């Protein structure tokens, strides 16, 4: 079934040259120009990778701190006890707990964006894995959210850390800021995540690794990027 778009989207799409791969700075300027949302829309970069995600060693997952943040104030929870709980609180975690926090989530509470845990808490956190997992919020060592250094993890999460992972088709989509960001700051964030994805190239991948990359605002059309400008 063909998706129908409204007049505003169609007008925005008309300003994007089909089949053209834009230089990064030009693409950022265009995405800002054609955005028509009546709020400060998010900007996302999307990669299409030549990876076989059926193979464990070709599944990308990780985290990176964007130099200019995401423009979103993240609510961070930490599963920790004792001194580590105190460290998390001092670092600015919104909620810190142990079995009580697990019980809250089991009861349906999900008012947070990032969950962090110390390794010793993972047995308890596992009781809510079926709730957190599908939402991509389960603490994981690969994203730095299972750690003894809870202060750094909280600081990173609050300071603009984003996580990335391939879906089953080899796509990676990551928020890189807001339409209101200065063009240079958006471009710097995009370069940061692009460098991270490029460095994460699995050794088993043959031929072209990044097949396509584009950026778009929440409701706006995608603008293809020239990889050579990243």
UniProtKB/Swiss-Prot annotation:
The record's Gene Ontology biological-process terms are: regulation of translation; translation
Q: Cellular component per GO?
A: large ribosomal subunit
InterPro entries in alphabetical order: Ribosom_uL1_bac-type, Ribosomal_uL1, Ribosomal_uL1-like, Ribosomal_uL1/biogenesis, Ribosomal_uL1_3-a/b-sand, Ribosomal_uL1_CS
One Gene Ontology molecular-function label = tRNA binding
Q: Pfam families given for it?
A: Ribosomal_L1
What are the alphabetically sorted keywords of the record? Repressor, Ribonucleoprotein, Ribosomal protein, RNA-binding, rRNA-binding, Translation regulation, tRNA-binding
**Complex formation:** Part of the 50S ribosomal subunit.
User: NCBIfam families in the record, alphabetically?
Assistant: rplA_bact (TIGR01169)
Protein name (database record): Large ribosomal subunit protein uL1
Q: Which organism is it from?
A: Leuconostoc citreum (strain KM20)
Question: What lineage, starting at the top, does this entry show?
Answer: Bacteria, Bacillati, Bacillota, Bacilli, Lactobacillales
Query: What gene makes this protein?
Result: rplA
């Amino acid at each position: 079934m063909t998706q129908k778009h409204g007049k505003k989207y169609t007008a925005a799409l008309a300003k994007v040259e089909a089949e053209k791969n834009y230089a990064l700075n030009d693409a950022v300027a265009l995405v800002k120009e054609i955005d028509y949302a009546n709020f400060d829309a998010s900007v996302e970069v999307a990669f299409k990778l030549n990876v076989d995600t059926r193979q464990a060693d070709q599944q990308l997952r990780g985290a990176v701190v964007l130099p200019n943040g995401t423009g979103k104030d993240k609510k961070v929870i930490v599963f920790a006890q004792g001194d580590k709980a105190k460290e998390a609180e001092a670092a600015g975690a919104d909620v810190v707990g142990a079995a009580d926090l697990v019980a809250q989530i089991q009861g349906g509470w999900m008012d947070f964006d990032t969950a962090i845990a110390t390794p010793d808490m993972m047995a308890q956190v596992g009781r809510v894995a079926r709730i957190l997992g599908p939402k991509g919020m389960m603490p994981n060592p690969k994203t730095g959210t299972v750690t003894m250094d809870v202060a750094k993890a909280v600081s990173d999460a609050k300071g603009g850390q984003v996580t990335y992972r391939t879906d089953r088709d080899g796509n990676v989509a990551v928020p890189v800021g807001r339409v209101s960001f200065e063009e240079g700051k958006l471009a710097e964030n995009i370069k940061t995540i692009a460098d991270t994805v490029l460095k994460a190239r699995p050794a088993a991948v043959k031929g072209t690794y990044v097949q396509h990359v584009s950026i778009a605002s929440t409701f706006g059309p995608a603008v293809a990027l020239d990889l050579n400008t990243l």
